[in-house]
Amino acid sequence: MIVLDASAAVELMLTTPAGAAVARRLRGETVHAPAHFDVEVIGAIRQAVVRQLISDHEGLVVVVNFLSLPVRRWPLKPFTQRAYQLRSTHTVADGAYVALAEGLGVPLITCDGRLAQSHGHNAEIELVA
């Protein structure tokens, strides 16, 4: 069981080399994420289209494929207080991933080096590159 953040999901969905490493790490795992995960990932896919890294059609396909990932989305409300407590070292969005990982007692998988180096929490954070 793991928590997957948006940076790792985007790499996975865009089939980058880091995404291949994420796919290997996810094998056999039950994947969890906070509810805002979808908005973050779809926003990043949109940015890939805007930057012409992928076509509009490819973006639509990636979104459809993303929405079919077997990820358990958790409501934000139970984790918002902890996410706010992490405000001095994390964005609220990142804090929600950390809070969920802490709450479930499972690793947080990320491709975000800054998040992987963060402190002030009890989560195990794995940087996948």
Swiss-Prot record:
Keywords: Hydrolase, Magnesium, Metal-binding, Nuclease, Toxin-antitoxin system. InterPro entries: PIN-like_dom_sf (IPR029060), PIN_dom (IPR002716), PIN_Pae0151-like (IPR044153), TypeII_TA_RNase_PINc/VapC (IPR051619), VapC_family (IPR022907). The keyword Transmembrane helix does not apply. Disulfide bonds: none annotated. Its cofactor is Mg(2+). It comes from the Bacteria. Belongs to the PINc/VapC protein family. Toxic component of a type II toxin-antitoxin (TA) system. An RNase. The cognate antitoxin is VapB12. This is Ribonuclease VapC12. It comes from Mycobacterium tuberculosis (strain CDC 1551 / Oshkosh). The gene is vapC12.
